[in-house]
């Protein structure tokens, strides 16, 4: 229970309507004779300003004073306290007792945590760095082996992932000039692209190799078989399909081989005849000029 001491004469005016008809009550007392200040009295004052009670007086230490509750009675009296007594007020509420929005508190904690979060330096001898360097070198070698340029790779990735990929991006990755975070992201993309490019290259090489094997495949015809084919050509230079099949069975050759031989033989015969005709025409022309 706290007390408010009055060191000077204080004037108390009752709040009833008859206050103007009575003289103000003067109270003189020392610091030892102080009035108790309670929250209950303050609350009563703020809620019952419309009530009017008489002002009973009592004596304390042979000095007249006025109290809110008279001894032996429950009659309440409301006063107008001096201004200097109201200026003291109550102590401020302690900050931790104030309620705070949990959402705002969580946001502040998260913001504080992120502001204190500092990226740890990367160890250049770590396994991740060595693995990244190894992949960059392997990627460059395999890219060149497949026949792709840095521009080809950048355009292929830009068509799928966006315009942030270019020849400069691939060049910086192969030279390890990107940040570790960006290089790790690009490594996954380039690894997938390289796998797909090698699959396409394998299919292309297989197809080209098969075509080359077909073109380079040659059949050796024996001298006896050539003589027999020459005799048949002298008899019939354009044999039918049945005759070609019969000759192939007799000479132990494939039907396609016999057919191609007759085609080539007719072309050679045509070139020989053309050459002979040109030679005869030239000789005749020279003979006429000499005359």
Curated annotation (Swiss-Prot):
Sorted UniProt keywords: Activator, DNA-binding, Homeobox, Nucleus, Transcription, Transcription regulation
Record-given protein name: Pituitary-specific positive transcription factor 1
Residues passing through the membrane, by range: none
Entry's free-text remark on domains: The 9aaTAD motif is a transactivation domain present in a large number of yeast and animal transcription factors.
PROSITE patterns linked: HOMEOBOX_1, HOMEOBOX_2, POU_1, POU_2, POU_3
Domain POU-specific: residue ranges: 124-198
GO biological process, one term: positive regulation of transcription by RNA polymerase II
GO molecular function terms noted in the UniProt entry: DNA-binding transcription factor activity, RNA polymerase II-specific; RNA polymerase II cis-regulatory region sequence-specific DNA binding
Organism: Macaca mulatta
Subunit structure: Interacts with PITX1. Interacts with LHX3. Interacts with ELK1.
Gene Ontology cellular-component annotations: nucleus
Function comment: Transcription factor involved in the specification of the lactotrope, somatotrope, and thyrotrope phenotypes in the developing anterior pituitary. Activates growth hormone and prolactin genes. Specifically binds to the consensus sequence 5'-TAAAT-3'.
Record localization: Nucleus
DNA-binding region location: 214-273
UniProt motif (9aaTAD) ranges: 5-13
One Pfam entry name: Homeodomain
Domain of life: Eukaryota
InterPro entries per record: HD, Homeobox_CS, Homeodomain-like_sf, Lambda_DNA-bd_dom_sf, POU, POU_dom, POU_domain_TF
């Amino acid at each position: 229970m706290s007390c408010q001491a009055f060191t000077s004469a204080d004037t108390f005016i009752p709040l009833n309507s008859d206050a103007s008809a009575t003289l103000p009550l003067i109270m003189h007392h020392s610091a030892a004779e102080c009035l108790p200040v309670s929250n209950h009295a303050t609350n009563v004052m703020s809620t019952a300003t419309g009530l009017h009670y008489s002002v009973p007086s009592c004596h304390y230490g042979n000095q007249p004073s006025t109290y809110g509750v008279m001894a032996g009675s429950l009659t309440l009296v409301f006063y107008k306290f001096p201004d200097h007594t109201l200026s003291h007020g109550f102590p401020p509420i302690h900050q931790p007792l104030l309620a705070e929005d949990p959402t705002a508190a969580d946001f502040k904690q998260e913001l504080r945590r992120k502001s204190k979060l500092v990226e740890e330096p990367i160890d250049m001898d770590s396994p991740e760095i060595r693995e990244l360097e190894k992949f960059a070198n392997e990627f460059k070698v395999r890219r060149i082996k497949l026949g792709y340029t840095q521009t080809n790779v950048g355009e292929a990735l830009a068509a799928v992932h966006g315009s942030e990929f270019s020849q400069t991006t691939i060049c910086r990755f192969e030279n390890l000039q990107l940040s570790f975070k960006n290089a790790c992201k690009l490594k996954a993309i380039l690894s997938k692209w390289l796998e797909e490019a090698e699959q396409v290259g394998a299919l292309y090489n297989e197809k080209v190799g098969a075509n080359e094997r077909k073109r380079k495949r040659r059949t050796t015809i024996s001298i006896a078989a050539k003589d027999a084919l020459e005799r048949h050509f002298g008899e019939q230079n354009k044999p039918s399909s049945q005759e070609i099949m019969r000759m192939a069975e007799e000479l132990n050759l494939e039907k396609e081989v016999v057919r191609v031989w007759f085609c080539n033989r007719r072309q050679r015969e045509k070139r020989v005849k053309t050459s002979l005709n040109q030679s005869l025409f030239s000789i005749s022309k020279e003979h006429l000029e000499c005359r």
